[in-house]
Design a protein with these regions (language model features):
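Non-catalytic terminal and connector segments of soluble metabolic enzymes
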Residues: 1-134
Length: 134
């Protein structure tokens, strides 16, 4: 069973059902989810590689601006992380038919959704947001 982490960002929770339907459309399932209000501690752990970069403060402020939906996603087989990233779409120029294109507002930071970029990132992020299942 492969697993990955997906998070709906502040301001986009109204798209939860449609986003989950797209995840299920590739044969994956959201096995655990929770609505959370993020704080500095969890954001510093989640975005550790971005600490000190010019956009970090804006990113943290945005991510604290409202609730998020954290999701533990699983699927039998291979390539779950890549398949999720395909339906999510690129950060800068998402293609039509992707989650970021279809539900986004054209901003890089406020881009609807986060998904792990590798199996290693998925394990780390699931450990941060779902320690009870790791």
């Amino acid at each position: 069973m492969e697993r990955t982490y997906v998070m709906i960002k502040p301001g986009f929770l109204q798209h939860e059902d449609a986003i989950i339907a797209r995840i299920e459309g590739i044969g994956a399932k959201v096995s655990h989810k929770k609505v959370m209000q993020l704080d500095d501690e969890i954001l510093n752990r989640h975005y550790a590689e971005h600490i000190g970069k010019g956009f970090f403060a804006e990113l943290v402020n945005y991510m604290k601006s409202g609730e998020v939906i954290a999701m533990y996603v699983e699927r039998e087989g291979e390539n779950l992380v890549q398949d999720i990233r395909t339906i999510v779409g690129s950060t800068k120029d998402p293609a039509p038919g992707t989650i970021r294109h279809d539900f986004g507002i054209g901003e890089i930071t406020r881009n609807v959704i986060h998904s792990s970029d590798s199996a290693e990132s998925a394990a780390r992020e699931l450990g941060i947001f779902f320690p009870e299942f790791n």
